[in-house]
Each structure stands twice: as C-alpha cells, then as structure tokens.
Amino acid sequence: MKQTNYSESILLGICEKLQLSPSLYKQATERYETIAHTIQSDPVFKEIELKMYPQGSFRLKTTVKPLSEEEYDIDFVVELPTNATMSPRQLYDHIVRILRHDGTHNDMVELKKRCVRVNYANDFHMDIMPGRSVNPVTHEIIVPDRELAAWYHHSNPIGFAEWFEQQAKTQIIDERSHFGKFSCEVEKVTEQEVASRLEPLR
C-alpha cells in the first residue's frame, strides 16, 4: 500500500507540473469570458442568442505545458443557433471586426484559415472557431471548411467532453473494483481521494 501511495504521489506531482498553473488558468478563463461577452454584446448579435464555450484540452482540463517555445493553445467555439442564416464567412468577419475595434484586442488578432486567433503576451493564444448548431439536444454542431465558404465538418466538442468525463469516472470505478476483488490489503478509496486523483488528468 505504501508503494502504491508513493507511486501515486509521484504521478500526481508530474501531472501538476504539466498542467497550466492556477494563475495562468484563471487568467485564461477571465480572458475567454471577456471575449465572449464582447462578441455577444455587439449589435449584430442583439437578436441572435449565441452559445460560446471552450473546447478541446481546455474544456477537458488536460491542457499541458507546450514543448520548447510553443504556446498554450486555448480553443473555444462561437456557435450560432440552428435557425441562423449567417454564413461561416459572415460570422468569422464579424468576430474579426468586433475584436479589432474593441479597444483591447485590436493588435492581437491573427487571421487563420478556419478560426480567429488572439495572441497574448504571456505564452498562450486563443483560437475562436465559428460554428452552427445542428442538434441542440445532442450538442452536435457544424464548422466551416478551410475556405469559410460553407458549413461543412460535423463536430461535437460538448458531447465528446461528456463522454470523456464518463470514461474517466468509469476507469476509476473499474480500478476500485479490481483492487477490491483481488487485493485485500488495499484500503477503500474515498470519493474525495478519487476526485483528487482524477482532477490533474482531466
């Protein structure tokens, strides 16, 4: 049991070193919320209820320190409702216009093929992907092709994140069942211990 605890403490230490620091994570979250509020507040979207949310590693809490001189990559989606008639190019151009004239992000905007990138000075950038809802119940969306000419690729960042969370919980439950069945020397893991072990890998 002592060996198991020692091994876990080493793994947890490694995970904590790989993660975004709490201060940088807080800063990234605040900046994401600022951009989301700025976009939604634009008059163009006064009658359109946008949905904005993180995707990828930032949503899953699996963001790790990049190699060499690379930056942290924070991704989020600006999602139009199902009945919206706005094209990918129109939504993309509105995001660019808003951020280039909001008094904060003017010189930080970089145009990418399928997303708008905001570059920050402290080693991370934020990629904003246009999207449109396909099925609000299943969270399926459609995102643009590389030319931003049409809604083309189907995606489901929220659905994948929910699946990932369930798999992580299932893995811990299976692990507990395994040890409970085959090793009578292993102490019962409390719910709090399970959460503390799971969190750094999410």
Regions found by a protein language model. Give the residues of each.
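Nucleotidyltransferase catalytic cores
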Residues: 1-15, 156-160, 167-202
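N-terminal regions immediately upstream of nucleotidyltransferase
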Residues: 1-71, 80-90, 94, 115-118
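Short, structured coil/loop segments at alpha-helix boundaries
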Residues: 21, 25, 42, 135, ...
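Conserved catalytic core of two-metal-ion nucleotidyltransferases
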Residues: 39, 43, 92-151, 155-185
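Glycine- and aspartate-rich repeat motifs characteristic of hemolysin/RTX-like Ca2+-binding segments
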Residues: 75
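Short, charged/polar low-complexity linear motifs in solvent-exposed/disordered segments
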Residues: 78-80, 145
